[in-house]
Amino acid sequence: MGDNKNNGDSGKLLYCSFCGKSQHEVRKLIAGPSVYVCDECVELCNDIIREEIKEISPKRDSDKLPTPHELRAHLDDYVIGQDRAKKVLSVAVYNHYKRLKNASPKDGIELGKSNILLIGPTGSGKTLLAETLARSLNVPFTMADATTLTEAGYVGEDVENIIQKLLQKCDYDVEKAQRGIVYIDEIDKISRKSDNPSITRDVSGEGVQQALLKLIEGTVAAVPPQGGRKHPQQEFLQVDTSKILFICGGAFAGLEKVIEQRAHVGSGIGFGAQVKGEKEKATISETLTQVEPGDLVKYGLIPEFIGRLPVVATLTELDEEALVQILSQPKNALTKQYSALFEMEGVELEFREDALKAIAHKAMSRKTGARGLRSIVESILLDTMYDIPSVDGVVKAVVDESVVKGESAPILIYEHNEAQAASGEQ
């Protein structure tokens, strides 16, 4: 076999047996028994094989569905606490993908969708749980904010745009998008403004719930590949939303009062009433675990919408101890992330235990939950991250309680074991 452009024996002009180009039009012409192939055709064949392998690999990976125990273990690696919610989510997600895997109904039994409603305070981990599950399953994931959604035809974002975002995440591969997870945050903000239907249109409340109904339950949504109203002439993609898992989340502030009111009905009033002491009163998190569909209706969600979210999981408010764990224990804990950033400069970053407690205490006082931790850590380390790339010889930075309280700067330790504050003071 040869790869020369000339045929020394006959002087005959040779052509690629695949594309027909002559030996003078290509860089290489590889000879076989009565056959020739050029370098361009070889490269094209390699590209085709690579694409086919890329398409087959994800399918092979997705053949094995993680069990609820495996899903829960993955959540434990990234999310602290919320044990009950993790178990509920793991089972619901497992059942959803089991339903997709065995699409043909057995004995005429068609399995319903297990869309999920997460109820819990801000910063308790609702979004992180949904994101981590999608990452664990290697499926497309997108988020939407319910407060920005409006009915079609009104100023704002159409509910169909949610599917548009999901398609963008997987390069408009409809098959992949139909296995995706959509997380809709602030779902409590689209509750009806009152129990009585209003004469005027509630385009960002009940109207959005109505618009989301079919999308969540399952419909074939026609989605333009390049966005909504701007390209009416282009061909639409057909996406079956019955295969997409929808997870809705919200803080539902005040829902505990609705639950308490329902629970106390019939418990007696006046002298016959049972009076609970301070210690007997349930916490807000404990009260929320008793939520029933009727409570959500009274809160302002329409019955049809609640019916599309059969799986309900409540998350507890994170205490100071949990926030300390969140700072240091998960695989992608904040302290580990910032340590990695400092390591890129050749500097070791150390957070002392009293510093972690002080950061958690500050987040608790701000009532931001885990969501507020990053901004606190960022503000503590800002000046140090600004200075370190320009300072030679720093091998370690230490953060203690006084740094978090703003009383001092992080301690910098140099190669010759001398230590000084990041500000340059001895």
Swiss-Prot record:
Example GO biological process: proteolysis involved in protein catabolic process
A molecular-function term among this protein's GO annotations: ATP binding
Chain positions recorded as ATP binding sites: 121-128
SMART domains recorded: AAA, ClpB_D2-small, zf-C4_ClpX
ClpX-type ZB domain ranges (all copies): 4-57
GO cellular component entries: HslUV protease complex
Alphabetical keyword list: ATP-binding, Chaperone, Metal-binding, Nucleotide-binding, Zinc
Positions bound to Zn(2+): 16, 19, 38, 41
Family matches, as Gene3D superfamilies: 1.10.8.60, ClpX chaperone, C4-type zinc finger domain, P-loop containing nucleotide triphosphate hydrolases
PROSITE patterns in the cross-refs: CLPX_ZB
Role of this protein: ATP-dependent specificity component of the Clp protease. It directs the protease to specific substrates. Can perform chaperone functions in the absence of ClpP.
Annotated family: Belongs to the ClpX chaperone family.
Subunit structure: Component of the ClpX-ClpP complex. Forms a hexameric ring that, in the presence of ATP, binds to fourteen ClpP subunits assembled into a disk-like structure with a central cavity, resembling the structure of eukaryotic proteasomes.
HAMAP family (UniProt xref): ClpX
Identification of the protein by name: ATP-dependent Clp protease ATP-binding subunit ClpX
Organism: Shewanella baltica (strain OS155 / ATCC BAA-1091)
Gene encoding the protein: clpX
